[in-house]
A protein has these predicted regions:
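Pol beta-like nucleotidyltransferase catalytic core
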Residues: 2-125, 135-253, 257-355
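A short, histidine- and acid-enriched strand-loop-helix "catalytic/donor-clamping" loop
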Residues: 129-132
Length: 355
């Protein structure tokens, strides 16, 4: 019986037919909706992620420039859509303008405050120095939108070094240097009696022998001799010249880790080191009640081959990565650009730097 055969159907049959037609129309929509809901919701995409980000370096750190030919960030570091330039004529089109603080602090460079600043352009303050060496920063209130620093809480973190996972684990016999002839050594050029590291050294050398190299003792080491010399020491004094948050320099990454000596560290708190270095890969001065206790521990450890070798276990899984090229640090900005707040401004840069 068809729905439109009105001769043989009454009002009740007509209602049934209309209900059936409605059901048949709605059913496909329900099935389509159920199928569509299997897929995750699409998030909004930042349009800037589809275009090149231009990073303008206003002046090269320490006056030492590097080549920016072709697509530097992609060719050297496989960072895409990142254009690194140093021509000031490109200021109007730059997404980020980077200023290295040392040249500003010394008065060798100035901020281009006289130029009309394009809408949306971000200015980045960059420094690898400890706060005490950054000079006065109060005049930079409400100017910078971004910080580039070794600090882990910076907008773009550029450490002196870090540990990266190895593709394949190594063998312990290959990881522990065997040519040890000195208990402890220290390479220092800038020696100041009032520095904490100088006071610790004076106390430590009364307990254990410490060989000292560097301009301070008029026994400087060439770059070629540095690591081979350190490799002959059981321990290396990786003492920072400033006790500041996250300030961990090449003294740990290059001198100690790459040199093949167990680092005895003095710098930021123990927690800062634990955040970036494997456990049982370093010895922190603050872990001991006195420098005398530290010295006695070093003597005992050097005599215990098994316990000493445990401090090199990290080399099974990790390898040291040093950051020495400013281009690599600058290209890293593009990896963070789209995730940073667009309207961020440092109202008190000095407070952040000293924080």
């Amino acid at each position: 019986m068809g729905c439109y055969n009105t001769k043989k159907t009454g009002l009740g049959s007509m209602k049934k037919c209309l209900f059936l037609l409605s059901f048949l129309c709605v059913l496909p929509l329900c099935l389509l909706n159920a199928w569509w809901r299997r897929f995750p919701a699409q998030t909004a995409v930042n349009p800037s992620s589809f275009r090149n980000i231009t990073i303008l370096l206003w002046h090269w750190p320490n006056g030492k420039s590097s080549s920016l030919k072709r697509d530097t960030c992609w060719d050297l570091y496989r960072i895409s859509r990142c254009r690194l330039v140093d021509q000031r004529s490109l200021f109007p089109s730059a997404d980020v303008v980077v200023f290295h603080n040392r040249e500003l602090a010394l008065g060798h460079q100035k901020l281009p405050l006289d130029l009309p600043r394009p809408q949306g352009q971000r200015w980045a303050w960059m420094s690898l120095e400890a706060p005490i060496h950054n000079g006065k920063l109060h005049q930079y209130a409400n100017i910078f939108n971004m910080t580039i620093s070794y600090r882990r809480d910076a907008d773009v973190t550029i450490p002196y070094g870090q540990l990266l996972p190895k593709e394949a684990e190594g063998h312990l016999v290959d990881n522990v240097p065997l040519n040890k002839s000195s208990l402890a050594c220290w390479v220092v050029s800038n020696y100041r009696k009032h520095h904490k590291r100088s006071k610790v050294y004076q106390e430590l050398k009364a307990v254990v022998p410490v060989k000292v190299y560097g301009r301070w003792t008029e026994t400087p080491l060439s770059q070629n001799a540095l690591l081979p010399t350190i490799s002959r020491c059981f321990f290396y004094l990786a003492f920072e010249n400033s006790i500041s948050k996250d300030y961990i320099t090449e003294k740990l990454w290059r001198n100690a880790y790459q040199g093949g000596a167990v680092p005895v560290v003095l710098g930021p708190p123990l927690g800062d080191y634990k955040s970036v270095a494997p456990p049982n890969s370093f010895i922190h001065v603050d872990e001991f009640a006195s420098v005398k206790d530290l010295g006695e521990y070093l003597q005992q450890l050097a005599e215990d081959k098994k316990r000493y070798s445990d401090y090199f276990t990290w080399k099974h899984q990790w390898t040291v990565k040093l950051y020495k090229d400013w281009r690599e640090r600058l290209c890293k900005i593009c990896s963070h650009y789209n995730s940073l707040p667009q309207e961020k401004v440092y109202s008190n840069l000095e407070a952040w730097v000293k924080g």
